[in-house]
Amino acid sequence: MIGLIGRKVGMTRVFTEEGVSIPVTVVEVEANRVAQVKTLETDGYAAIQVTAGTKKANRVNKAEAGHFAKAGVEAGRGLWEFRLENGEEFAVGSELTVELFNEVKKVDVTGTSKGKGFQGTVKRWNFRTQDMTHGNSLSHRAPGSIGQCQTPGRVFKGKKMAGHMGAERVTTQNLEIVRVDAERNLLLIKGAVPGATGGNVIVKPAVKA
């Protein structure tokens, strides 16, 4: 399914004709350039590889420079891939713009969530805190028991404990497109999307729409 690579600009709001305020996230979608077309014959699956944005020449390594030069496209800030469905065809060097979403009502947005560092169970997993008084003087935010005794004699995998929080791939589904601004290459999406301001996001037509 073809999507677009964008950059999260921030949040604002727009008003309907009735005066209702709608919170929106502004996603800047510069033209996505096709850097490679993968086919069943050569790669075993059909897909396109795209790049977006720009990258300083001194930040492009030789492998990347050769890859972009072969495609005849300007080096971008990364490479992303979209699987092709039956009948879809694209040429190397062609561009995908925000107009791809002119007829789309709902989208799925994927980004990297904000990193929170090492966090305890209360913040990371919404555990309840223990008593602030009534004889408890040390274990207010402690997780409590993490398992049994000699049987099984270990902590089960997946146990919710303190650890690194955030900085992981997150997808928010079924977000509504409020406006497509082709002139300024902007998508206005209702609500919040994952990640920090300036982060890369992948916008695709919603799979559950």
UniProtKB/Swiss-Prot annotation:
One of its GO terms (biological process) is translation. The keyword Ribonucleoprotein applies. InterPro entries: Ribosomal_uL3, Ribosomal_uL3_bac/org-type, Ribosomal_uL3_CS, Transl_B-barrel_sf. GO terms for cellular component: cytosolic large ribosomal subunit. Pfam families: Ribosomal_L3. Methylated by PrmB. The keyword rRNA-binding applies. The modification N5-methylglutamine is found at Q150. Keywords: Methylation, Ribonucleoprotein, Ribosomal protein, RNA-binding, rRNA-binding. GO terms for molecular function: rRNA binding; structural constituent of ribosome. It comes from the Bacteria. One of the primary rRNA binding proteins, it binds directly near the 3'-end of the 23S rRNA, where it nucleates assembly of the 50S subunit. Belongs to the universal ribosomal protein uL3 family. Part of the 50S ribosomal subunit. Forms a cluster with proteins L14 and L19. This is Large ribosomal subunit protein uL3. It comes from Vibrio vulnificus (strain CMCP6). The lineage of its organism: Bacteria, Pseudomonadati, Pseudomonadota, Gammaproteobacteria, Vibrionales.
